[in-house]
Structure formats: C-alpha cells, structure tokens
Amino acid sequence: MIKKITALTLLVSTALSAETLPDSHMMRDMSMGESRRALQDSTREVNQLIEQRRYQQLKQQRLLAEPEPAARALPQSAQCLPIAGVYLQGVTLLSPADLSALSALPEQCISSNDINRLTRELTRLYVQKGYITARVQIVRPNSQGELGLSVTEGFIEKIEGGDRWVNSRLLFPGLEGKPLKLTELDQGLDQANRLQSNTTKLDILPGRQVGGSVIRLRNQHAKPWLITAGTDNYGQKSTGQWLARATATLDSPFGLSDFVSLNANSTLENPAHRYNRAYTLLYSLPYGAFTFSGFASFSSYENHQQLPHNVVKLHGQTQQYGLRSDYVFYRDRDQIDSLSGQLTYKRIDNYFESVRLEVSSPTLTLAELSASHLQILPNGVFSANLSVEQGLPWLGADRHPSSVHLDSQFTKGKLFANLSQRLKLADATYQLNNLFYGQYSRDPLPGVEWLSLTDRSAVRGFSRSTQTGDNGWYLQNTLSRSVNIGTATLTPRLGADVGRILPRQDSSGWRSSAGLSSGATLRYRQALVDLEVSRGWILSNHATPEDPVQVLARFSYIF
C-alpha cells in the first residue's frame, strides 16, 4: 500500500509541478546514455582483448620459412625418353581439379625437360597448399612403359618442446600423425603468441620415419602478468570526467595457454555525490583453430541533479555476461577468414530516486553471428567484420513489445571495416588509418543498442551534445607519424571524422555530425602520455548549442 501511495504521489507531483522535477525525457536520456556507454565500453574492451596480438604470424609475414623443396630431377635434356607416359602415386592431398592445372605432357616425345617441369609444378602445388615437406621422387617405368612420380606427402611424427606456457595439446590438437600443413602450424603459433609473455617459434626437423617430421617448439618466455594503471578525463560531466583505470592480465593461469584479464575504472571527483564505476572480466582458452571466451561486466553510476527547490538522485547499474567462440576456417600467407558466435545477456536497471525507470531498464538476451576477414596488403592491413544480432526470449529477457519496452527480439546488422596503410610523403613515412562502422535494423531498438554518434569512439570532438539513433554510420580518418626521440617515441596525429544517424523515435530524418582533432602520443619505456584537442559540429540542427573545444589527456604506466 505504501509503495502504491508513493508511486501515485510521484505521478501527481510530476503532473502538477513540472518545475520541481526533471523532464521525463531528460531522465530517460541521461540514464540510457550512462547504461549505453557502460555496455558499449565493456564490449569494446572485450573485443580489443580478444583481437589483441592475434594473427601475429600473418602480420609479421610468418616466422616459418616456406622453402620450395628440391625435387629429384633428371639431367636436363631435350631428347626423347623411352617411355610411353607418366603415372602418379601417393597423391592424396590434391584434388583432380588441382592436378588438372599441371601442364600436359607431349603425346609422342617426352623428354627429361618435360619430366622436370612436371615435377616442379607438382611440388609447387603442394607448397602453395601449405604441404611444404612433400617430396616427389622418380621411379622406374612400369610394365606399360610409364615412368612413375611417387609423392611422399609428409606428416607430423611428433611435436615436442611444449610446457605450461605453450601447451602443444591445445595449440596443435590432433596434428601428430597427420599431414604437415604450414597454415595449421601458423595457426598454433598465433595462438601461442597471443599471450604477451610468449615469443614462440618452431623448427621442422627430420623424423625417424619416412616422410615424418618433428616439430620442435622454442619459446622465449617473459613475466606472465602485466598491470597497467592510468588516469584520463574521458568521463562524463554528470558523473565525473577524471577516471582512474587499472588492468591486470595473467597468461596461462591453468597451464592451458589460456588468458585472463580484469579491468576496472572509477571516477575520481566527489565520489560521495557522483560516480561511475565499471569492471570487466575476460577468460579465453585456445583449441587449435578455435578460441573460446567468456566475459562478464558490471557497472554502476550515480549523479545528483540540482533543481530549483531540491536535489534528486539518478542512479543505476548494468550487468553483461557472454560466451563466445571464434573459428579460423581459412588462412594462407596473405589472409585469414574466421567465423564467430556469441551469446550475451544484458540487464539494465535505472532509477529516479527509488523508482525504477522501466522505459530505460530493459533485459536482453542476444545471439550474434559474424564473419571476419583480414588481408595483408603491400603497404598495410585491411580487416572487416560483418555480423548479425538477434534478440532472444531467453534467460528472463523481455518477451513482448509494449508501450514501455521496444521489441527486445530485434534483428540488427553491423559492419566494421578498417584500413591501415603506410604512406610516403616528402620522404617521410606516415600511417593512415580509416575506420568505418555502420549498423542497421528494421526494428525499433532498445536505447542501449543505439549508435551514439557523439561518443569519442565515433565522431571525435563532442563533450556536451548527444546524437543517438537506431541506424547510422561513422567514418574515422587518422593520419599519424612516429618519430624517435632518443629512447622515446613521439607520434603526432591529425583526425577528421564524419557520421550520420537515423533515429526512429522521431521524424526529424537523418542527422549528421563532423569532428576535427589533433593530438600526440609520447611513449617512453613503460610510460605513455597522450594529449588531444578536438571539436565537433552538429551539421543537421543549427539550433543545437555549439560544443566547445575539447581537451583530453591520458596517462598510463605498465608495471
């Protein structure tokens, strides 16, 4: 009964005295903005940790050599050999389509040169597919007068040199006794070297059996833990701009070449009256071409709004839990293609004083499928990720659309693309980075799933204005150059960003924003200092107050 009276009093007070209570849209936008930033920041942290140091073999143009094995050739001669043809034996790893690419032999006169050419082409086919230990030998003609080409395709006899930091059973599962394929070894090295404490290489040595090879792992191991502490003014004015951050990582805590990370941050200003705190935990485990990950994040905020006659409190918290699996289904010397699946649970609770704001407090369960591509270019790297998210009525998620909650069973598509390339300008080397992100949904999305165009991870330069919407895109462009100053590295940069959003909650149509930025990063041993000056403009609404010039600073140290 008391709760009913309190709620009724609140509603009546809102209707009778708009001057004493904040606007409902303002409360919704503020609470939703805090929740959205918390969830999207933790998602970015998880993705960065998962992608960090992956694909080192490809980016470094691999640590393994690709020597073309020397085939046993006949003496060079154009004279006809006393043979009626050529037959192959021992070929199991090449398809008929592969073999059809071989040059045809003459029907009447087959010379040593023809046999040598065929042997080289056959060997090259194996090498191109990654079977670098395949050997082609010439055997005497059979009863039909056909010369034989016998292929020893090569297999992994044994893998040795593993330890608790490089767990060969999980990095190279099931490879012993199977054909030696270079891309599978590269994949295992990628998994080993994704741990910052590992610098793993391998040697391919002759085995005891015919065609067998021994894989010997060599690892230079550093300390398995890292702690990074820092501070920056990337926070919000409502909850505090200056934040303290700390990240702790531990490599192979269970001897499985696994990885665990804990990230925490909190605002520093007046924590008794306003704060924003967030924690993210990630664990990942490799298994050959698979990487399995689990993550959890929690955040809370509180701020007090000064009204003409009193002070009111807005506060809330977010929870996010997820399971993810990544699978590399194709790779060669220049590219990697992978698939991933993820299940995420999100719960958001926002309050005005003690009243839960239902409109900005959804509970969601999302399934996401994505495909990724990484391509090494002559002067850079290109990566892209295309994904689809589907809301599900599982784990207590909101089930039905209503006037309070938008449909939690939405479908959303996302596209991320990044091009990083080296440029030569006036005899100096520059780095140009172009990053594109876009999302689209035919369904009205919950506010925590909107794209925030004025977030510093999108269009840089905004500290006051907010532009959010269901659908939209942005493009970040950054030109930088690294200069060595003694043992320090200074990297100045210039940035220009643009983006558009289409909110479904009103009929104003597309909205556009742009931003310019300049900054510099100084790295000296384990210390980092970053300064940035930026400014953003709302291009589609001239009634919006202009944002001032924004100055951001970040300091961090790795222990």
Regions found by a protein language model. Give the residues of each.
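Gram-negative bacterial Sec-dependent N-terminal signal peptides
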Residues: M1-E19
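Transmembrane beta-strands of outer-membrane beta-barrel pores
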Residues: T231-G235, S252, A264-N270, A296-E302, ...
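C-terminal beta-signal and terminal closure region of outer-membrane beta-barrel proteins
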Residues: S507-F559
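Periplasmic polypeptide-binding modules associated with outer-membrane biogenesis and secretion
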Residues: T20-G235, N265-R277, L435-F436
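A generic beta-sheet turn/junction motif
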Residues: N142, R208, L285-A289, Q375-L377, ...
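Gram-negative/organellar outer-membrane beta-barrel architecture
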Residues: V166, D186-P378, D547-I558
